[in-house]
């Protein structure tokens, strides 16, 4: 698939224009024009970039991308290393913050709820962005293994 076609689809599917965010949503670093393999991660860290390259990915799709509102704008040190590594491999990096928080099927909250077997509340039941479950309040806190 062509990068421009995929970015257009993501822009529309995730309703990016509906969100006022702290960071840019969409393509943050342009790489190869053909996208055949995608790696997903929470953050565009050096470890995630290296894993995407090792996996033969053409796109690293992340929840926490780069260039946050209050972040320094200079490209030095860790930011330089990440950008350099991705550019040398032709790796595209796209980040979607609030759009992935809110999407009812593809979003982080929706996917976590699916894995946990939770059912979403009706849209009118909560003002919060994302997916909630009425049973969540009755569940003890802590971590567990699923799957």
Spell out what each predicted region is.
Residues 1-147:
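Hydrophobic structural segments
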């Amino acid at each position: 698939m062509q990068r421009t076609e995929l970015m257009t689809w993501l822009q529309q599917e995730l309703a990016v224009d509906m969100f006022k965010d702290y960071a840019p949503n969409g393509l943050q670093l342009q790489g190869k024009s053909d996208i055949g393999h995608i790696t997903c991660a929470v953050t565009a860290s050096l470890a995630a970039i290296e894993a995407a390259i090792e996996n033969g990915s053409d796109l690293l799709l992340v929840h926490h991308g780069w260039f946050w509102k209050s972040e320094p704008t200079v490209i030095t040190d860790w930011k330089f290393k990440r950008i350099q590594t991705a550019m040398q491999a032709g790796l595209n990096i796209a980040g979607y913050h609030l759009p992935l928080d809110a999407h009812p099927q593809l979003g982080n909250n929706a996917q976590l709820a699916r894995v946990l077997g939770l059912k979403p509340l009706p849209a009118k039941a909560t003002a919060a962005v994302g997916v909630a479950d009425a049973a969540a309040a009755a569940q003890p806190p802590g971590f567990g293994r699923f799957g």
